[in-house]
Amino acid sequence: MLTLQTWLVQALFIFLTTESTGELLDPCGYISPESPVVQLHSNFTAVCVLKEKCMDYFHVNANYIVWKTNHFTIPKEQYTIINRTASSVTFTDIASLNIQLTCNILTFGQLEQNVYGITIISGLPPEKPKNLSCIVNEGKKMRCEWDGGRETHLETNFTLKSEWATHKFADCKAKRDTPTSCTVDYSTVYFVNIEVWVEAENALGKVTSDHINFDPVYKVKPNPPHNLSVINSEELSSILKLTWTNPSIKSVIILKYNIQYRTKDASTWSQIPPEDTASTRSSFTVQDLKPFTEYVFRIRCMKEDGKGYWSDWSEEASGITYEDRPSKAPSFWYKIDPSHTQGYRTVQLVWKTLPPFEANGKILDYEVTLTRWKSHLQNYTVNATKLTVNLTNDRYLATLTVRNLVGKSDAAVLTIPACDFQATHPVMDLKAFPKDNMLWVEWTTPRESVKKYILEWCVLSDKAPCITDWQQEDGTVHRTYLRGNLAESKCYLITVTPVYADGPGSPESIKAYLKQAPPSKGPTVRTKKVGKNEAVLEWDQLPVDVQNGFIRNYTIFYRTIIGNETAVNVDSSHTEYTLSSLTSDTLYMVRMAAYTDEGGKDGPEFTFTTPKFAQGEIEAIVVPVCLAFLLTTLLGVLFCFNKRDLIKKHIWPNVPDPSKSHIAQWSPHTPPRHNFNSKDQMYSDGNFTDVSVVEIEANDKKPFPEDLKSLDLFKKEKINTEGHSSGIGGSSCMSSSRPSISSSDENESSQNTSSTVQYSTVVHSGYRHQVPSVQVFSRSESTQPLLDSEERPEDLQLVDHVDGGDGILPRQQYFKQNCSQHESSPDISHFERSKQVSSVNEEDFVRLKQQISDHISQSCGSGQMKMFQEVSAADAFGPGTEGQVERFETVGMEAATDEGMPKSYLPQTVRQGGYMPQ
């Protein structure tokens, strides 16, 4: 709906502002001024005036006017309502060159309707033209130039005006493409003054330059000379003759000339002195030129008094001076190579080609003369620049001359010293440095008189040999530059050798670069030694081909995976460095950079891991521990060795030999000893029986039950005292275990004695209830340990049985040997021991029976022996019960007692490996 309303308003406005015939009607208003041109940075006011008919139709007045510049609304603060029909707007400090200003009114619905529009043009007024000058080119019309001043930003017209004193010439308007110059269209008249000035005009103003008055002849610019040619002279090799054709104006004015020349390869010109060419001429001879040298010439002219302008330069012309004999001897040097012939040496003579300005002509050949000291001459004619000869080890004098068409040069003299010559007096303070894209060499001259200096240089490379170039300098020179094709980033080895009258001096060398650059690649670092907290890094010096300059320093960058990077600077002379304060068992990343004066280059990155322990740290721990263990072991062995008797007593006590004891002296009736040939013969099968032999008094009339009762008491005493036996029954490692014999009702308290020798003692007397007197024993001289009874005789007492019918029995003494596992199990049952007794074979029984029979026959007679045998055969080796074993012991006692046998001591048990007293 709003769009339709807007369209209707616009259509109505168009209808009201046009006539029915289509012609435009008068606008609703206008802006004054109509087409303003204002000066930059000035103030400007525009007024918009509305017409009455539009005001009545749209019901508006000046309050409804809206000003806009370039479609942007101007703030109302700049508006001024003059009356109901006019409104003005003011601009201050106009900076824009072009402003579109429109006057608009607000109609129905606050719609803006354009009333009128203008363009404000800004600019500057013209400045006064300056530096007006005119030039009269020969054969052409006068042309004037000036300085138009600042830019006005407006269309500005320049007009050149000229007149004589009596005649005014037509104006010359400058063209748009050349606004500061203009050429008049009339012919120039010499020797008549003319007045000239310039007018400048634009929309903001008009100005006129100063007037100048001159004679055109003083503004003449002649045409350049033409047909320039150069001619040489055969008589004089240092001159060239120039000829040319002068311009036609020479008939009007006197000319002077400016002649310049240069060699063909030069870029700068040399000039003939102006006073030599200050008059009109058509030729000139140039002198003091170099022979056989091509020169280029050019020439120009102007009015003699200098008023006017120089002509343009003529076309260039060239010519070559005639030849002359070489002006200088060539540079001459030598090199000595080892010779394969004894007493000779190979000498290579070398020289430099003379430059054209010194050769003064085409070189035909070289003449070399060798003179040995106080000897004949050797002449050589060479077309090359070197000569190789074989010379003796003597001193030689070499001369060199160069020849052209005109003649020979002066001779270059060179002394070749003998092979034993010692060079001395080198130059001092040798320096080399780049400057102005040249490599300069400087030194301090020796005190001795130097004829010349030889400078040699070559490019150092690891891939190619050092090809030497050289040059010669005069003996008075102490600073020069290397004349050759030098390359950047290359290391040059420069050698300076002073040459004296008697031969060369000692050479001095130095390295230098024409221009340095960063290295082509960085050094490769590697580890030489890695420790727990440090690492020794090493690297190789960079090849000279990739250094590109002097290596000033190295920088080592190292870091862990998560740590910050650390940089360490290292002197360039070092090839290894030790990183300290590292962390053990850590991965490190290392790279290295080499730096020249122009920058650095990083090498490849390298990684290494520090060990967890330092070198020798494990050894430092293990070795002391091992030494301590070894020392402890040695001390233990020494202790055991020193205390071997004590240890042996506790671990392996000595078993006393009863045969060497004084036990036999306890009774005045000691039974004879039985000498058995061998235990192996007695018991070849390794088994024997535990036997108890009890001697009973022969005259004892006590009934058998009482005897048994006494025997039971004896057996109980034996069981109770078995653990208190003396050392006679000690352990022996050669003995084997055997069970002891006890009654069946004492199985739980019996002990399994290993290799035990038991003794039973029965004290007999005619009177049973009479206490026997204490026996006195004497100490044996044997070295065997004493028995318990021997050590303590007071313990030996007799047992008196009274009223009860008990027999008199002494305390039973027995001895043990322990060396087997049965010693640790003393609680073995009597039943087990009985089984061992019953397991004796028949052969053992027969052998034992025979032994017992022999013993009884000596002490008791054949009656007792018969009874003992019968009892032993019937009971002791019967079905193998404990009762039977006990019976065997009892019967033996009765037999011994009835026969009145004196008391004796016999072993109860002898096992294989045990000790058996003889």
UniProtKB/Swiss-Prot annotation:
Sites carrying sugar chains: N43, N83, N131, N157, N227, N379, N383, N390, N553, N564
Domain notes: The WSXWS motif appears to be necessary for proper protein folding and thereby efficient intracellular transport and cell-surface receptor binding. The box 1 motif is required for JAK interaction and/or activation.
Quaternary context: Component of a hexamer of two molecules each of IL6, IL6R and IL6ST; associates with the complex IL6:IL6R but does not interact with IL6. Forms heterodimers composed of LIFR and IL6ST (type I OSM receptor) which are activated by LIF and OSM. Also forms heterodimers composed of OSMR and IL6ST (type II receptor) which are activated by OSM but not by LIF. Component of a receptor complex composed of IL6ST/GP130, IL27RA/WSX1 and CNTFR which interacts with the neuroprotective peptide humanin. Interacts with HCK. Interacts with INPP5D/SHIP1. Interacts with SRC and YES. (Microbial infection) The homodimer binds two molecules of herpes virus 8/HHV-8 protein vIL-6.
Protein name, UniProt field: Interleukin-6 receptor subunit beta
Chain ranges on the Cytoplasmic side, renumbered to this chain: 642-918
Tissue: Found in all the tissues and cell lines examined. Expression not restricted to IL6 responsive cells.
Short sequence motif named Box 1 motif, residue ranges: 651-659
Induction annotation: LIF and OSM activate the type I OSM receptor while only OSM can activate the type II OSM receptor.
Industrial and biotechnological uses noted in the record: Two extracellular parts of IL6ST/gp130 linked to the Fc-portions of a human IgG1 antibody (sgp130Fc) inhibit IL6 trans-signaling by the IL6:IL6R complex and has no affinity of IL6 or IL6R alone. Also blocks IL11 cluster signaling through IL11R.
Gene name in the database record: IL6ST
Motif (WSXWS motif): 310-314
Residues with the Phosphoserine modification: S661, S667, S782, S789, S829, S839
Domain Ig-like C2-type: 26-120
Task performed by this protein: Signal-transducing molecule. The receptor systems for IL6, LIF, OSM, CNTF, IL11, CTF1 and BSF3 can utilize IL6ST for initiating signal transmission. Binding of IL6 to IL6R induces IL6ST homodimerization and formation of a high-affinity receptor complex, which activates the intracellular JAK-MAPK and JAK-STAT3 signaling pathways. That causes phosphorylation of IL6ST tyrosine residues which in turn activates STAT3.
Superkingdom field: Eukaryota
Native organism taxonomy: Eukaryota, Metazoa, Chordata, Craniata, Vertebrata
UniProt-listed SMART domains: FN3 (SM00060)
Domain Fibronectin type-III span(s) in chain numbering: 125-216, 224-324, 329-424, 426-517, 518-613
Stated consequence of mutating V252G: Induces ligand-independent activation
Disease the record associates with this protein: Hyper-IgE syndrome 4A, autosomal dominant, with recurrent infections: An immunologic disorder characterized by recurrent mainly sino-pulmonary infections associated with increased serum IgE. Some patients have onset of symptoms in early childhood and develop complications, including bronchiectasis or hemoptysis, whereas others have later onset of less severe infections. Immunologic workup usually shows normal leukocyte levels, although some patients may demonstrate alterations in lymphocyte subsets, including T cells. Hyper-IgE syndrome 4B, autosomal recessive, with recurrent infections: An immunologic disorder characterized by recurrent infections, mainly affecting the respiratory tract, skin and eye, and skeletal abnormalities including craniosynostosis and scoliosis. Immunologic workup shows increased serum IgE, intermittent eosinophilia, impaired development of certain B- and T-cell populations, as well as impaired acute-phase response. Disease onset is in early childhood.
Result of changing A517P: In HIES4B; results in impaired cytokine-mediated signaling pathway with loss of response to IL-6, IL-11, IL-27 and reduced response to OSM, CNTF and LIF
Family per record: Belongs to the type I cytokine receptor family. Type 2 subfamily.
